Amino acid sequence: MRVSTLVLSTSIIPIATALNISPFHNIEKKDILADAASAAGGAAAAVTSGAVGAANTVASGAAGAADTATSGAAGIANTVASGAAGAADTATSGAAGAAKTATSGAAGAADTATSGAVGAAKTATSGAAGAAKTATSGAAGAASGAETAAGAAASGAETAAAGQETSGAGSLVGGSGSSNSTSPSGGSGSSNGTSSGSGSGSGAGVGSGSGSGSGSRGSITGNSVATGASSGPAGLGISSSISQSTTRQLQTSGSSNSSSSAGMGNVVVGMNAVALAALVLI
């Protein structure tokens, strides 16, 4: 048993040596492997660190480029926005200026139209006032003409009346009519005449006259006074009357014609004279 164990042990050592599986050799091999593993780990760590650093560098560069691009895009956007805002402000200012110009032009046109309308209204008012004055003047002229015609007619009427009065006065002065005849009450006068007297007797007088005249307008005043006195033998009842008449005419131009007939008066006077002579003879 011991021999077999020894033989086995003796035979294992050379085999283990040949196979490099001795315990000492394993320790060394382990150190080498550890060193190799450490070296590989260091290299891997270095590669990893380098890769991480490169990745970080790339990421940083990409981030920086992205930031730069973002900043550039933001700047461009801000520039575009500012330009658009400036263009909008310019357009707004231009539109406001155009609107103000249009408003000013419209206001000026409205003022011009208003002034024209006011001028036309004033012209129409002046024309209407002138036409009214002309019509008033024409009406006044027509009224004046009517007054002139009325004055002429009145003047003609007054002139005719003056002719009639003159004719009556002529008949009185001529001795025809009641003014120059004998009557129981004395003498009588016409044309605003008064008479006074007393006496007795009988007599008749007839007088007629006509007058016509024309002339300018004037005023006519006339006074006729007749006074009578009776005389004759007392108790005979015969009297004669004498009358006096005066007529005054002022500011009257015209012509008149008068005629009188006193035949009957003269006949009566003659009869009275015959009767008186007969009584004297008796």
UniProtKB/Swiss-Prot annotation:
Membrane topology: Lipid-anchor; GPI-anchor
Keywords: Cell adhesion, Cell membrane, Glycoprotein, GPI-anchor, Lipoprotein, Membrane, Signal, Virulence
Biased composition range(s): Low complexity: 236-264
Residues with glycosylation annotation: N180, N192, N257
Superkingdom as given in the UniProt entry: Eukaryota
One annotated Gene Ontology cellular component of this protein: side of membrane
Chain residues in the propeptide: 260-282
Example of a GO biological process term: cell adhesion
Lipid moiety-binding residues (GPI-anchor amidated serine): S259
Induction conditions: Up-regulated when cells are growing in an adherent manner and upon milbemycins A3 oxim derivative (A3Ox) treatment. Expression is also regulated by CYR1, RIM101 and SSN6.
Composition bias type Gly residues, residue spans: 186-216
Region (Disordered) location: 163-264
Signal peptide per UniProt: 1-18
Transmembrane helix found in the keyword field: no
Subcellular location: Cell membrane
Functional summary from the UniProt entry: Probable cell surface protein involved in the process of adhesion and early events of invasion.
Protein name in UniProt: Predicted GPI-anchored protein 23
Gene expressing this chain: PGA23
